[in-house]
Curated annotation (Swiss-Prot):
Residues 319-362 form a coiled coil. This is Protein phyllopod. Residues 241-320 are annotated as: Interaction with ttk. Its main location: nucleus. InterPro entries: Znf_AD (IPR012934). Essential adapter component of E3 ubiquitin ligase complexes; involved in R7 photoreceptor cell differentiation, embryonic nervous system, external sensory organ development and specification of particular muscles. E3 ubiquitin ligase complexes mediate ubiquitination and subsequent proteasomal degradation of target proteins. Required for specification of R7 photoreceptor cell fate in the eye by participating in the ubiquitination and subsequent proteasomal degradation of Tramtrack (ttk), a general inhibitor of photoreceptor differentiation. It comes from Drosophila melanogaster (Fruit fly). Residues 109-127 are annotated as: Interaction with sina.
Length: 400
């Protein structure tokens, strides 16, 4: 649809906005919804696939209004999608509904029907089939076939007999060496010759004795010999399969914590465990070069970091130095009272003992009450601050 037709269809819009302005020429894309002046009407006749049918096949709806537009990118995307569908389904280029394209396709089909291409193909196919049919019909001399076949058989049999003769020679010679006294009792005469020859042409003649009970005795001895050193092997192989714990943190994670101001250190093992297991006392370091197999079974995701809290992570935080307890409060109060008493005794050396006692007891009561209140407030604040931190076992935070 041209701009003149659009102005006739919408005369009010044409009057309101100037004809040369770009805002008037901007249209909304049916697929992506962008507002641009580079649009194409979907009902315009064109060569290639029908855009309306492509929209219906891809998005399962058919635009009924003629004032529907597509931007250039969506138009190209639809055409590319259609070509990919045609390639995947082994089809030719799609036929549009335009009369020119339809006429061209009909003419091409008629031309292909008129071409006498199929008349030549059967002659080419018949020729190779006639050649192998003539080959079995030609008779070949039947007499040499069994002769060649018999020679091959004889050669194969002679090869097999030679192999068997070698095996029997070795077995019989060993048996003759091991049991010379029992030749007369259990003797076996073996004569090997190729088939179809005289008796004089024998390959070998071996007289041997078949040992019946010796293999069983050998097996018993072998089993006893293999059974005795098994505990020695087990005792030697136990330290080889000893597995040390996996380094808890990767080197990259350690470097990351160092840049953030966090230092990682492993806690020293207990003395009794080191004495009991001297081999296990020395654990591998965190950044250990030994890359052993992981002990955990589940594979870690990309955004997961495994932290085993058998190490101490010390961080510098601006909070209280230590946790306040009731016993420490009592000890601090007693020390402060003793210091105050000593100072007051030095000031009032010239006074009598009764006056010193009265003067020392009077200021002690409000100060002790005041200091007790301050210590309770400090301990309460510290407990409130530390109550929010739920630390796992093995994690210690040193507060400075």
């Amino acid at each position: 649809m041209s701009t003149n037709q659009q102005q006739q269809a919408n005369p009010s819009a044409a009057v309101a906005a100037p004809a040369a302005s770009s805002e008037y020429l901007k249209r909304t894309c049916l697929i992506c919804g962008c507002h641009t002046n580079q649009t194409i009407n979907i009902y315009e006749p064109r060569s290639g696939p029908n855009i309306v049918q492509l929209i219906q096949a891809k998005f399962k709806f058919q635009p009924l209004n003629e004032d529907k537009f597509l931007c250039f990118s969506c138009n190209n995307w639809l055409i590319n999608w259609h070509s990919l569908q045609a390639v995947n389904s082994n089809e030719a280029e799609s036929q549009s509904q335009s009369p020119s394209h339809m006429g061209n396709s009909v003419l091409q089909q008629e031309r292909t029907k008129l071409r006498p291409v199929a008349m030549v193909r059967p002659t080419v196919r018949v020729q190779p089939q006639s050649q192998p049919q003539l080959q079995p019909q030609v008779p070949i001399n039947p007499t040499p076939a069994p002769i060649v076949y018999s020679k091959r058989r004889a050669s194969r049999r002679s090869a097999s007999v030679s192999r068997m003769s070698r095996v029997l020679r070795q077995c019989c010679v060993e048996s003759l060496r091991r049991s010379p006294k029992k030749r007369n009792q259990q003797s076996v005469f073996v004569c090997l010759r190729p088939q179809g020859q005289k008796r004089s042409n024998a390959i070998c003649k071996v007289e041997c004795v078949a040992p019946r009970r010796k293999p069983v005795e050998r097996l018993v001895k072998d089993v006893a010999a293999t059974a005795t050193p098994t505990p020695v092997l087990n005792t030697q192989s136990t330290p080889t399969y000893q597995r040390f714990p996996q380094p808890s943190v990767d080197g990259k994670v350690v470097a990351m914590f160092r840049r953030l101001g966090t230092t990682l250190s492993r806690e020293e093992p207990a003395a009794y465990s080191a004495e009991s297991n001297p081999a296990c006392s020395k654990l591998p370091q965190i950044m250990s070069p030994l890359k052993e197999a992981p002990r955990w079974t589940r594979d870690l995701d990309d955004d997961e970091i495994l932290l085993e809290f058998d190490t101490a992570i010390s961080e510098v935080l601006p909070t209280a130095r230590y946790q306040v307890t009731h016993e420490e409060n009592k000890e601090n109060q007693q020390a402060q009272e003793m210091e105050l008493e000593l100072e007051e005794e030095e000031e009032v050396d010239g006074r009598a003992e009764l006056e010193v006692v009265q003067e020392a007891e009077a200021p002690l009561e409000p100060q002790s009450h005041h200091k007790q209140g301050n210590s309770h407030q400090n301990s309460h604040q510290a407990s409130i601050q530390l109550a929010g931190l739920r630390l796992p076992m093995g994690l210690s935070i040193s507060l400075v």
